[in-house]
């Protein structure tokens, strides 16, 4: 299973095409729209989210609420397009309009300058329109489809915010996926710790007042995962590696870790490895989950626990020093409409990309042509691993 996305931030809209879904899987537009709505929320979002009310149009691959096994095409309209029709026109425009909203002063930390050099764009709007995090709208749409597939197989995904601007949630126990879903949805910053959430919101407000931005850390937990997804046989078959790639592919994300993550470097092996248990009721389990649900690049039946770190958004309302690519003189960087903090929304995007990789791994391991046989094979595999 794979997908491609297309579209610019201020173009007519965004498109994704998914190939490889099994036939007969239940899927409605509402399954996607509820995830798009979640992505638009969160304390710290900018004015753009008051304009866009994202709704998906499914244009291919579904009939009467079920997938056909053919490519699924989805489109999300940009409501703000009406204000950008000339600037972002697909057809040629009069010469006097060609330089409207031209960007020649790249923003530090963004794709502007390097993208311009790579593709020869002397108007870096051609770069920023595609590199914008607006593209994650259709990544969330694709992830919503993956989450639906996983849900039907008894696998659930939830994300939440662990840290914003140096304030970290004080979590003294592990949370079930259902708890994470319920508690995070009730928080303006998608945080499980109400006290920390208040401090996070204050830091976001302070950053906005100062024309600055702040980043943070999100965590995604996947429960109900069968053992044996991914493989140790080749480096590029390891599922944790694929998930790590997916996490750092999200706009502004700079790192990923599983389980205790980088803390493992400061602990002896006896405090990191997860002891193996067995019972007739549950089969093989682990006493702890320090490795985040992975051993040898494969799922071990414990919940997947992965975290990603998001840098502060590079668009600053008090811009940093840059250079005009025309004159080579020093100027302040360009300013585009932006959020002061998008970490809460990014947790939804992280859910989507993790769900996608897990769904792909499921379809790689089991027959993926028909959804009814897929469900049967997953259940048979669960029983086999339990009886091993």
From Swiss-Prot:
Reduced FMN (FMNH(2)). Pathway: Metabolic intermediate biosynthesis; chorismate biosynthesis; chorismate from D-erythrose 4-phosphate and phosphoenolpyruvate: step 7/7. NADP(+) binds at residues 39, 45. Homotetramer. Its EC number is 4.2.3.5. GO terms for molecular function: chorismate synthase activity; FMN binding. It comes from Listeria monocytogenes serotype 4b (strain F2365). Its cofactor is FMNH2. It holds the Pfam family Chorismate_synt. This is Chorismate synthase. InterPro entries: Chorismate_synth, Chorismate_synth_AroC_sf, Chorismate_synthase_CS. Belongs to the chorismate synthase family.
């Amino acid at each position: 299973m794979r997908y491609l996305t297309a579209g610019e931030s201020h173009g007519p809209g965004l498109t994704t095409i998914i190939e490889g879904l099994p036939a007969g899987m239940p899927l409605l537009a509402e399954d996607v729209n509820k995830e798009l709505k979640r992505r638009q929320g969160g304390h710290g979002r900018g004015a753009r989210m008051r304009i866009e009310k994202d709704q998906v149009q499914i244009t291919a691959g579904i009939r009467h609420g079920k997938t056909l096994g053919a490519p699924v095409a989805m489109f999300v309209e940009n409501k703000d397009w009406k204000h950008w029709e000339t600037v972002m026109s697909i057809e040629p425009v009069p010469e006097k309009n060609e330089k409207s909203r031209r960007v020649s002063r790249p923003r530090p930390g963004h794709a502007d300058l390097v993208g311009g050099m790579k593709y020869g764009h002397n108007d870096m709007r051609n770069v920023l329109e595609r590199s914008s995090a607006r593209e994650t709208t259709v990544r969330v749409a694709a992830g919503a489809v993956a989450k639906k597939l996983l849900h039907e197989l008894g696998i659930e995904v939830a994300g939440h915010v662990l840290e914003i601007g140096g304030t970290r949630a004080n979590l003294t126990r592990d949370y079930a996926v259902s708890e994470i879903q319920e508690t995070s949805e009730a928080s303006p910053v998608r945080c499980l710790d109400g006290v920390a959430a208040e401090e996070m919101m204050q830091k976001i407000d302070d950053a906005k007042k100062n024309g600055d931005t702040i980043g943070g850390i999100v965590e995604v937990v996947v429960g109900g995962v069968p053992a044996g997804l991914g493989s140790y046989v080749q480096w590029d078959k390891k599922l944790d590696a694929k998930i790590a790639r997916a996490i750092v592919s999200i706009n502004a994300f700079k790192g990923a870790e599983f389980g205790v993550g980088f803390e493992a470097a400061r602990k002896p092996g006896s405090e990191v490895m997860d002891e193996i248990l067995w019972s007739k009721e549950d089969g093989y389990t682990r006493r702890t989950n320090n490795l985040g649900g992975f051993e040898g690049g494969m799922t071990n039946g414990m919940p997947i626990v992965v975290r990603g770190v998001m840098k502060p958004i590079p668009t600053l309302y008090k811009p940093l020093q840059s250079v005009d690519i025309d004159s080579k003189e020093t100027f302040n960087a360009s300013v585009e409409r932006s959020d002061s903090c998008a970490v809460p929304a990014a947790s939804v995007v992280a859910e989507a990309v993790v769900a996608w990789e897990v769904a792909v791994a499921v379809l790689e391991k089991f027959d993926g042509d028909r959804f009814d046989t897929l469900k049967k094979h997953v259940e048979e595999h669960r029983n086999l691993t339990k009886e091993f």
